[in-house]
Amino acid sequence: MKKSIVVLFSAVLPFAVFADDAKELVSKLDVMQGIKANFSQKVTDQNGKLIQEGSGVIAMHQPDAFYWHLTAPDESLIVAKDNSVWVYNPFAEEVSILDMEDILKASPMALLVHRDEKRWNEYQIDRKGSCFDITPRQGVESAVDTVSVCFANNTLSDIRLTDAQGSTSHFSLSEQAAVTDADESLFQFQIPDGVSIDDQRRQ
């Protein structure tokens, strides 16, 4: 479970520390600040064979706020805020709680909402058309080989994650809108009554 959460995850910093492609990505994220959208997901194996399809809602807001609600085929929920990440499986009636730091170490996806110069410098960023590939530099451990984020003008439109086994998760976004004050409750996870709690945070 923890590995799948790490694969799913991925700032705005002083421009002086970035190469040109990274500067441009940071600028687009700076303009965006926060986004809420519906998504459709397709997961394919290394041979391009479709493994799974899904849909749900995603929201991101800087700094360090992330919401991912898979509604089909099976419901699951991930909420990240500040230093903690909550992973809720309604079918299993279980909540796992992780340190945000563990997610940041393992996935470039977290860069989209995190302000950490050290983390940004661990990744190579290359523009390819309207997309930006985020790749761990040599020696950086990551469950994800590449995260590609694509924009239509200044609106985030697609996220593609490729893992070490060659599997690809493609999230196509629709009905994008700015995060408003009314959406802030998305990032405040309330643990349901009666569920099992697996708190893996370092105290």
From Swiss-Prot:
Subcellular location(s) per record: Periplasm
GO biological process: lipoprotein localization to outer membrane; lipoprotein transport
InterPro entries the record matches: LolA/LolB/LppX (IPR029046), OM_lipoprot_carrier_LolA-like (IPR004564), OM_lipoprot_carrier_LolA_Pbac (IPR018323)
Key words of the record: Chaperone, Periplasm, Protein transport, Signal, Transport
Pfam families tied to this protein: LolA
GO CC terms: outer membrane-bounded periplasmic space
Keyword Protein transport part of the UniProt annotation: yes
Range of residues in the leader sequence: 1-19
Function: Participates in the translocation of lipoproteins from the inner membrane to the outer membrane. Only forms a complex with a lipoprotein if the residue after the N-terminal Cys is not an aspartate (The Asp acts as a targeting signal to indicate that the lipoprotein should stay in the inner membrane).
Family: Belongs to the LolA family.
Binding partners and assembly: Monomer.
The protein's name in its UniProt record: Outer-membrane lipoprotein carrier protein
Lineage start: Bacteria, Pseudomonadati, Pseudomonadota, Gammaproteobacteria, Alteromonadales
